[in-house]
Amino acid sequence: MLHHYGKKYYSLGSSILVTSSPEPYLLLASVAGAAFVVLVTTAASKHGTVVGGVLTALPLTGAWAVAIIGVTQGIGSATGAVGGYLLGAGVWFSFLLSYAILAKWGFWQALALAFLVWGVMTSVVFVSGVRDFLTCLAGGTALSIAILCVYFKRLKFEDYKGERRDVGWTKLVARFVGSFAILLVALGLSSVRGPFLGGLVSTAPIISSQIVYWTYIEQDIEFSRSVTKNIVLTGTILIIPYGASIWWFYQYFGRSFGTVYGIFFGTLCGYGIAAVGAYAAYRVATFLAEKQILASQSSP
């Protein structure tokens, strides 16, 4: 019964939403994205790399992009954008990993090469024709976990504390202006080239590049590299479950409630999986340590 109701609501909602004028929503989305950059960079500078990374990886900008695609183009387009959003998360993390590895040779060289990596991978994903939701989910998840393993097994960045100091209005305005186009570009591409590309670009590194730039300017290169680790960690925990949740909830509850339920259940599921994984890793590590102690005690 719920399924039938959802389809009826959906059909009606789509016919209404497609006729919505996109301009106010595009402007509002751009303002929200720029304000988000100001918030995150200020929090990272004051409270450290963990806070900055966690805030950056919250699925807020992607959720906003998918929701506004639903407003301007219909719910069907919004659900079509989720596949690109999921694969885009893995490609976005590739950008961050590339920057983190290359940054020790220079900030601007690393940033330029990281954008090149992101551009090539985005183009490959788009022209490959992969649109199936489960394929996008599996691909985005596998890529995200692989990149996370590189961070924790190979790079092993330390976390840094921030400095509680006032940030001048000039810097805040510069951050806002420099980040204004993030969702405007994504939504514009979705209307021209289809919602899948809009979802793919909604996780574009435009916001995170601003964040690593400002943390580099205000702190140093190691602080900036460390932020990327926490972005990938939080993003892997939250973005993939959120994307899967919103894809399902959109079909039954529409844009508004689908977004709310998707954020709630995606976050709950993500942190639940992370907690179970952390506990399992702790138990395995404890077992191996106890086994090693027993072996050393039994040896002559």
Role assignments for model-derived ranges:
Residues 21-33, 55-56, 75-91, 134-143, ...:
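Structural signature of hydrophobic alpha-helical transmembrane segments
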Residues 27, 154-197:
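Selected transmembrane alpha-helices and immediately adjacent juxtamembrane segments
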Residues 50-59, 105-116, 134-141, 163-176, ...:
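Cytoplasmic-side transmembrane-helix entry/capping segments in multi-pass membrane proteins
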Residues 56-72, 238-243:
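A generic, lipid-embedded transmembrane alpha helix
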Residues 69, 123-130, 180-191, 239-255:
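Hydrophobic alpha-helical transmembrane segments in multi-pass integral membrane proteins
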Residues 76-85, 93-138:
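Membrane-interface helix-loop-helix junctions at boundaries between adjacent transmembrane segments
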Residues 139-144, 205-206, 261-279:
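Small-residue-rich transmembrane alpha-helices that serve as helix-helix interface/gating elements
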Residues 181-219, 225-226:
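Transmembrane helical segments that form the transport core of multi-pass membrane transport proteins
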